[in-house]
Every structure is written in structure tokens, then in C-alpha cells.
A protein has these predicted regions:
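Protein kinase catalytic-loop region centered on the HRD/HxD motif
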Residues: 117-127
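C-terminal lobe helix-coil module of Hanks-type protein kinase domains
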Residues: 119, 138, 148, 168-252
Length: 293
């Protein structure tokens, strides 16, 4: 059945499938803004326990406001359909951007830093994602990472086609809330640096992709559980930013040390200009001489 509107939201077009059900691009007819409307799947909406979980999620999301987390606006119901309204984000999923190929290391570190900083704010109020993958990260045209489906891990296997929690053959060491999120950042960072998800025995990113800077290897290894993993997302974010700054300084030093490139065409153009000028002066002199002498 085609859905034309839900409450004050006019449905414009399908936009994909999320952890809860089908997602649509819609317009808020009261204020004119574009939003994302998720129609909650019947198997979730008809389950009293799941409904209660959604209400808890909606209340918890109100405590988190971060530019790298998709904002939830409303959880409503219209004509028996349960729906969720959230910020509409234009961009591509990180999974699509990677496409089986390594990203520029500096870009990968920047995106991972954004994700970790968002998690730091969320974890500070005990709000955990629980199922972060490259599919749940949308990157805007301006390069901002936006975490989607935040707090919906409980539904990730409830709806066919929804993003799951599997991360290759790797698994987080234990199932302790925030630690799962930090482990997932390590998985995503490895995938961005190498073009593929880590598997046991894969080694560090620089061993898979020689263009990946070795300075990032200890961070990825620790995030994936070695040496006890990271205790907080804030610590992970700080270390990522530090490595990013180091790479920036190194690049600036490299650019400053590079000899200036001299264009050989400029002298030729300069000589040609002088020749043309000389010919013009000679012609003018000849004209003046034969005119007045």
C-alpha cells in the first residue's frame, strides 16, 4: 500500500531501509523542512516489548545532541502506523565510499575521529549504539560523518534487510556496552585504511596497505582489543586527532622542503614578448624615418 502522508509529514520518495523498517524522504508541511520518516515494521510495532524499547530510545536520544549523530525529532503514530521522524542526511554510506578500496589515510583518520567524538558525547549520558558498521555511517558532501540508527541495536536482527552487527570474522572482546562501540570504530578504521574488514591474523593496516601510515597501527590494534582496548571514546578520539595532526605537520614539512618547480615555458614567453616589442619599435622607427626624412 502506498503511503502519502503520516501526520504532518508528506511522503516524497523511498530512501532505503533501516533497522526499524522502510525509510522515506518526507516534508514537514508545517515548517517546510525535509526529514526522514521511518515506518516501523509491523513485526516490531506489534510487539509491546519493542514498543517500550522504542519509547526508551526516543527519551534517551533527547539527551544527545551532536553534529555527528543523526537527530531524532519525533516518534508518532498515524492510522495504526508507528513511525519515527529524524534528520534527513544527504550523502553516501561509508560502506559505499570505501567500495573495497582504501581511503586516503588522512581522510580515514578524520572520519574515525568524528565518529569517536560523537560516541564520547553519547557514552557520557549512557547512550550506546551497539551496532556501528560502515553501513550505519553516512558521509555528507562536505565530509561530515553522521551516525545513523543510534541506540537501535536491539532491532538490528528483528527486521529482514536491516544492518546487522557482524564485523567480518572479528568480534568485540565481550559484550560490554560502550566497548562494543569502540571496537567497531577500530573495525571501521581498519576497513577505511585497507579497503576490507579485518579478520584474525590480518595484522596491522600498514601490513595490508603500505600507504597506510604506521603511526595509526597501534591505535587500530588497541581498538580491536589488544592491550585491553580503549576505556573511553574520548581517549580514542584524542589519539586519532594527535596522529592526524602529526601527519599534517609532516606533510607541511615535506611541502616546504620540496624545491620550487620552475616552469621552462615562462622564459620562452618572456623572450618572445621582448622580440615582439623590438619588432614593433623597429617598425615604428622605420615609419617615422620614411615619413619625415
Amino acid at each position: 500500500m502506498t503511503i502519502e502522508a503520516l501526520g504532518q509529514y508528506k511522503i516524497l520518495e523511498p530512501a532505503g531501509t533501516g533497522a526499524l523498517g522502510d525509510v522515506y524522504r518526507a516534508r514537514d508541511t508545517r515548517v517546510g523542512t525535509t526529514v526522514a520518516v521511518t515506518v516501523v515494521a509491523d513485526e516490531i510495532a506489534s510487539n509491546p516489548e519493542h514498543r517500550e524499547q522504542l519509547l526508551r530510545y526516543a527519551r534517551a536520544s533527547g539527551a544527545v545532541s551532536h553534529p555527528n549523530i543523526v537527530t531524532l525529532y519525533e516518534l508518532g503514530e498515524d492510522a495504526g502506523r508507528l513511525f519515527m521522524v529524524s534528520e534527513f542526511v544527504q550523502g553516501q554510506t561509508l560502506k559505499t565510499i570505501i567500495g573495497g578500496r582504501p581511503l586516503n589515510p588522512r581522510r580515514a583518520i578524520d572520519l574515525a575521529s568524528q565518529i569517536a567524538e560523537a560516541l564520547a558525547d553519547a557514552h557520557a549520558v549512557d547512550f550506546v549504539h551497539g551496532a556501528i558498521t560502515a553501513d550505519t555511517i553516512v558521509v555528507t558532501p562536505k565530509g561530515r560523518a553522521k551516525i545513523t540508527d543510534f541506540g537501535l541495536a536491539a532491532f538490528s536482527t528483528s527486521f529482514p534487510g536491516a544492518a546487522g552487527t557482524a564485523q567480518g570474522s572479528h568480534r568485540a572482546p565481550g559484550d560490554s556496552s560502550a566497548q562494543v562501540d569502540l571496537f567497531s570504530v577500530g573495525v571501521i578504521l581498519f576497513e577505511m585504511l585497507t579497503g576490507r574488514a579485518p579478520v584474525p591474523g590480518a595484522g596491522v593496516p600498514s601490513a595490508v596497505n603500505r600507504s597506510s601510515p604506521r603511526e595509526i597501527d597501534p591505535i587500530v590494534a588497541r581498538a580491536l582489543g589488544k592491550n585491553g582496548g580503549y576505556e573511553t571514546a574520548a581517549t580514542l578520539a584524542a589519539e586519532l586527532r594527535a596522529v592526524g595532526a602529526l601527519l599534517d605537520v609532516r606533510q607541511e614539512a615535506h611541502d616546504a622542503a620540496a624545491p620550487p618547480v620552475m616552469s621552462r615555458s615562462k622564459p620562452k614567453r618572456s623572450y618572445a614578448a621582448w622580440i615582439v616589442l623590438a619588432l614593433i619599435l623597429a617598425a615604428a622607427t622605420a615609419w617615422w624615418y620614411f615619413r619625415f626624412v
